[in-house]
Structure formats: C-alpha cells, structure tokens
Amino acid sequence: MFRWERSIPLRGSAAALCNNLSVLQLPARNLTYFGVVHGPSAQLLSAAPEGVPLAQRQLHAKEGAGVSPPLITQVHWCVLPFRVLLVLTSHRGIQMYESNGYTMVYWHALDSGDASPVQAVFARGIAASGHFICVGTWSGRVLVFDIPAKGPNIVLSEELAGHQMPITDIATEPAQGQDCVADMVTADDSGLLCVWRSGPEFTLLTRIPGFGVPCPSVQLWQGIIAAGYGNGQVHLYEATTGNLHVQINAHARAICALDLASEVGKLLSAGEDTFVHIWKLSRNPESGYIEVEHCHGECVADTQLCGARFCDSSGNSFAVTGYDLAEIRRFSSV
C-alpha cells in the first residue's frame, strides 16, 4: 500500500506534456531534486526526505530569433559515470547545465532548414548512455553528444537515423560489458521503436513496428522493453529480438509516463485516466519468458496526469505531476 505524503508546492503548474517530471536523488546530501516544465520555463526544486521544500528556481529556454519566447519540451537529469548534467530541450535547441542548474555548459541550436513551413521544430526525448547523452528531435533523428569528464567541451559525435517521425522518448540501461547487447531504445509518434547498441558508434539492432498509436514513454530493464502507448496499453518486448511477450490493458486513456525502479524491476505507469499503477517485472527461470504482476493502483482524482517518477531505486516512493495542478504529489509505501 502507498499513502499520500506531503506535497511539494509549485510556483505555477505542470504543462500538459508527457514525461513532465524528472527526479534526481542525492543520497549523500539527503536531498531529492525535482524538475517540471511549464511553458517557457522549467521549475527546479530541492526537497528533504519528508517533502519539505528547501529551494526553488526557474530556468528559461535560450532565446532565438523568434518573437515569442520558446516553449520548453522536457527537462531531465542525465547521470553519467563521472558527472551529472541537467538537460533542457525546447523549440529552439538543447541546453545542458551542471546538475544544480546554475551553470550552462553547452548550447546546441536546432537546424530548421529541413523542416517544412508547417512543421514544428523541437527536441524531445533525453537519456544518458555511458559517456554520451542522446536527444531526440522533431525530424526523427537522435543527436548523440560526447560528454567529457569535466568542462564544456561537449561534441555532437553522431546523428542516428532510424525514425521518420518525431521522437517521443529514449530509454537506456548500462551495457555491463556484454557484446551485441541492446542497451538503448527510441520511440516516436507513430509508435515505432528502434533498439540500439551503444558505443563509439551506435548500431541499430532491430525495429519494432508501431500499430497506429504514438508511444509517449518507454523504459528498458534487463533486456526488457516496456512501452506505453496512446491507447492505454503497456507492451513488454524482448529487447534483443523485438518479440512481444506481454500486452497489458493498463489504462483507460493514453499513457503519459513510465518509470522503472531498477533495483527491483518495478514499473510505474501513469495515464490520462487519473490512475497510477505499479507492476512487478520478472523472468520465468525455466522458460525465460517475461512475466508481470500488478502490485498497486492509485487514483489521483480530478487530475490529468502528465508526469510520474519513482523517488528511489527500490520503488518505495513515487511522485506525480498533473496539468493545472500547482504541486508535486508524493506517495510512499506503508
């Protein structure tokens, strides 16, 4: 069972964007950072374990040549082997900051030359893979940035061309030294998934076709791809082959966020039906097939959810954001 803990107030509310919550745990400092997007700004908050807000500040998208301020599409902390960077994407470009958000170390402007006059230009979908940070774009390309151990000498090292539709989300997991391992998956507005092997050069391993609905959120855990779709379903695929093992009718409306507690294999799903569910993923020791068990369901009444994240790697607490909701709601197990 989970209970509603003390909420963390926001200055505004959360924009109606999928995956609109990022969480960074800082156990050494007994702090948790939260990041939420609202229009042209991103709100960064730090809170003590009891949910007591300690600090709050705003980041704004870098101005371009346009008349109106650019809208932010996502904010996400990327945990690299040697540093943590905060990445902010917008309709203008990609901004990278030190983890506290005070120092910008890199700016990449989006090239709108290939876009048609009626096509929106934006970046969306952020994940760290080794010493790389991968960011999706409106064109379907994934930009791969090589991150140094310190300093601002960040380099765009590669562009991955597996998609024809805008990227929605990217998920990664450590490769753990295995050969030919599938350690990154990208999703797009058509529901297509591309599975990659990271490295000095990223390699496309397989494509998992869509079926007419977008895939707003995707996660990867021990070779299992969890994909949340616009029809409320969660699909579990074998990453190396792309084979579908499990199909869950998880929500009555579109899924807006997935997250994984990596230590225990718990999957968090949030949908526009106001529900949050927790699932336990595992493999049958004899057949190797993927299995799933429903652990918990929570209704956040009268709220269009748009973000959900575990607050710890063991899945004992989670937080959610909602459109027009001026707080981050926290839940913990009892």
From Swiss-Prot:
Keyword hit for Membrane: yes
Resulting phenotype, K280R: Decreases cross-linking. Abolishes ubiquitination
Tissue expression pattern: Expressed in epithelial cells (at protein level). Isoform 3 expression is highly increased in colorectal cancer cells.
SMART domains: WD40
Single GO cellular component term: motile cilium
GO molecular function, a single term: protein homodimerization activity
Subcellular location: Vesicle; Cytoplasm; Cell membrane
InterPro entries on file: WD40/YVTN_repeat-like_dom_sf, WD40_repeat_dom_sf, WD40_rpt, WDR54_beta_propeller
Residue ranges the record marks as coiled coil: none
Cysteine-cysteine disulfides: none
UniProtKB keywords: Cell membrane, Cytoplasm, Fertilization, Membrane, Repeat, Ubl conjugation, WD repeat
Major localisation: other
GO biological process entries: fusion of sperm to egg plasma membrane involved in single fertilization; negative regulation of receptor internalization; regulation of epidermal growth factor receptor signaling pathway; regulation of MAPK cascade; single fertilization
WD repeats by residue range: 162-206, 208-247, 250-289
UniProt remark on domains: WD6 repeat is required for cross-linking by TGM2.
Oligomer status and interactors: Homodimer and homotrimer; forms tight forms of dimers and trimers. Interacts with IZUMO1 and IZUMO1R/JUNO.
Functional description taken from the UniProt entry: Plays a role in the adhesion and fusion of the sperm-oocyte membrane through its interactions with IZUMO1 and IZUMO1R/JUNO. When cross-linked to form dimers and trimers, it has a regulatory effect on ERK signaling pathway activity in response to EGF stimulation. Colocalizes with the EGF receptor in WDR54-specific vesicle where it sustains the internalization and controls the degradation of the EGF receptor after EGF stimulation.
Protein name: WD repeat-containing protein 54
The species this protein was found in: Homo sapiens
